[in-house]
Structure formats: C-alpha cells, structure tokens
C-alpha cells in the first residue's frame, strides 16, 4: 500500500498579468521516464485555451537541481524579509545616517 501517490502532473499558476492574457506556471511532469520542472509563460490561443510559450525554462528534477533551487528561493525570501524588517524598524536611522552633506542630490528615503 502506498502512503502517498504523487499526481502524474503537477501544475500551479504562479502569476497572471494585468489583462489576464498571460500566466507564469510551475509545472512538473515526466518525459521519457524522467521528471522535469518547468517555469514557463502561458498564453491563451484563439479558442481561449492556455498553451505553453517558448519563454521559460525546463530542468531535470534531481537532487542537485532541486537543492539548488530550494536554497535560492530560501535566500531570496530571507533577503526580502530582512529588508522589510530593516525598513520597518530602522528607516529613520538609515535615512538620517545616509543624508549627504553639502551636496545638491538626495538619497531617496525609505518609506514604511
């Protein structure tokens, strides 16, 4: 008995453009017995069916690729959260410390 049976194809819409004519999708499927991860733009054809475009990437799902992708996503999320925390709690100090003296240009202030 299998405790978990993976679907034959995984698909998730990651983003949609403003006029709903393009999507970015994360898709995992098998091709010739090997699993692949795709991050690809999709468009609607004349019959309003979503079709994959040539814009995107596909990579084999193996331990090294999956680990590298996971590490990259964790780093991106960590950096975004760190920046948000710094801006929220220290924007006044940052803005004060980086104001130029005796110059005509100004460093943009961080808004919270």
What are these regions (language model features)?
Residues 1-19:
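Negatively charged, low-complexity tracts enriched in Asp/Glu with abundant Ser/Thr
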Residues 11-13, 22, 54-56:
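A general secondary-structure boundary signal
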Residues 12-15, 28, 43-44, 104, ...:
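Sequence-pattern detector for short linear motifs
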Residues 18, 46, 61:
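Solvent-exposed, flexible loop/coil residues
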Residues 21, 36-37, 79, 105:
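General helical secondary-structure elements
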Residues 24-55:
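A short, structured beta-strand/loop element
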Residues 55-112:
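Mixed-charge, Lys/Arg-enriched low-complexity segments
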């Amino acid at each position: 008995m299998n405790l978990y049976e993976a679907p034959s194809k995984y698909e998730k819409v990651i983003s949609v453009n403003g006029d709903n004519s393009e999507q970015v999708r994360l898709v995992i499927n098998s091709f010739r017995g090997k699993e692949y991860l795709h991050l690809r733009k999709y468009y609607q054809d004349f019959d309003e069916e979503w079709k994959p475009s040539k814009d995107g990437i596909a990579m084999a799902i193996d331990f090294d690729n999956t680990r590298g992708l996971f590490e990259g996503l964790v780093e991106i999320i960590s950096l975004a959260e760190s920046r948000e925390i710094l801006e929220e709690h220290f924007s006044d100090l940052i803005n004060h410390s980086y104001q130029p003296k005796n110059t005509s240009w100004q460093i943009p202030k961080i808004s919270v």
